[in-house]
Every structure is written in structure tokens, then in C-alpha cells.
């Protein structure tokens, strides 16, 4: 049902985001299909977004499939942005300080996609937003960074590189002082495995 639609994934609904989605639908001439965070602490998200065609409980497969098959994607979720990049979908993201603006800026700056972020209080789509994105330079940058990271790890593991605390301080420090995984940590690990399995299943379909 996502084909030919703007799909949104909104973690923190607000009046401004609601107006933005309606404006995007009007300007791009596409119907909306909306998804929200459905954790128990966010049970009122449906009411706060207050838009038709909002899924009450999207399954993992539906969530991924909607992003994969949509015409355009709008989100205030960092992980939503990540999957838009993986699936090479045209997207806009709404700055979300509640969820950590730094990682949004870091990723988008790295890929030279700063223009894909809207301010937190944006109520309207910028003029002349294209329905497509040229992912060739984005994918090239991603491949470069992945290759550099893989090379760094291989050198660190083989002893060719001195993997000191100064070189990757926080990562090493956390590794050295890591405690046995908590129940929450085990659940997160299981969730990542389920997400990976769902992703590969969607890709094969």
C-alpha cells in the first residue's frame, strides 16, 4: 500500500509536523501513509498526529516494506533516515533534538546531504523539492567510508595499527570496562537480529 505514497515515520508528533505532512502531500500531489512509535509510553501518538491513513500497529515487515516501496519518505527518526539511505529512497528528515540532533547532523554532513534536514518547527515543505534523489554520489561516499572502516579494523586486529585509547577512545574504553549484558541489552541484541532477518526477507520479496 506504500507504492505511490508519501510514507512518514514520526516518533514525536507535534502540530508543526502534522502541518508539514499535509503540506507535503499537497505540494507533491501524493497521498500519505503514516507510521508512529507505538510503545506503551507513546500510546497517544496516534491522537497527537491525528491524520487519516495512520497505521495503528505496523509489523516489522510492514515498517520496512513501507519505507522500501514508498515514493517519498519523511521522518524525525535517525533510524528512519538510515533505512531511507539503505533503500536509496528520496527523503526529508525533521530535526529531532529529543532523539539527538548530533547524529543526524554527523551522518548527513558526512554524506553531503545537509539540505535533506528541516528545522524542528518546519510547517511547510520547501519550494521545488524534487521527488527523486541522485544516490550515485551518496553510495560512492558510503562505500569509501565502509572501505576505510573495514581497512582500519583489519589493521587493528592484525597488529599493523596501534589501536590505542587515544585513537578510538570511547569505543575502546567502553569495551575495556564493559559489564555483562543486562536484560535490556540482550533484548536489544535480539531485536537487532529480528530486524536484520526482516530486512533480508523484504529484500528477497
Task: Label the predicted regions.
Residues 1-205:
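Active-site anion-handling motifs in enzyme catalytic cores
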Amino acid at each position: 500500500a506504500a507504492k505511490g505514497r508519501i510514507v512518514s515515520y514520526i516518533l514525536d508528533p507535534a502540530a508543526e509536523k502534522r502541518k508539514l505532512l499535509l503540506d507535503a502531500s499537497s505540494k507533491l500531489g501524493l497521498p500519505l501513509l503514516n507510521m508512529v512509535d507505538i510503545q506503551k509510553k507513546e500510546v497517544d501518538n496516534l491522537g497527537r498526529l491525528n491524520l487519516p491513513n495512520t497505521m495503528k500497529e505496523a509489523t516489522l515487515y510492514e515498517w520496512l516494506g513501507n519505507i522500501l516501496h514508498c515514493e517519498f519518505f519523511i521522518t524525525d527518526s535517525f533510524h528512519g533516515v538510515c533505512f531511507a539511505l539503505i533503500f536509496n529512497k528520496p527523503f526529508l528528515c525533521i530535526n529531532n533534538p529529543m532523539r539527538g540532533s548530533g547524529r543526524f547532523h554527523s551522518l548527513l554532513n558526512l554524506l553531503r546531504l545537509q539540505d535533506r534536514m528541516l528545522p524542528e518547527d518546519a510547517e511547510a515543505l520547501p519550494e521545488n523539492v524534487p521527488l527523486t534523489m541522485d544516490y550515485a554520489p551518496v553510495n560512492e561516499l558510503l562505500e569509501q567510508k565502509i572501505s576505510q572502516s573495514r581497512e582500519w579494523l583489519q589493521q587493528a586486529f592484525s597488529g599493523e595499527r596501534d589501536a590505542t585509547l587515544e585513537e578510538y577512545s570511547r569505543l575502546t574504553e567502553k569495551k575495556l570496562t564493559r559489564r555483562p549484558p543486562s536484560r535490556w541489552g540482550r533484548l536489544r541484541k535480539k531485536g537487532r537480529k529480528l530486524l536484520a532477518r526482516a530486512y533480508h526477507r523484504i529484500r528477497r520479496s
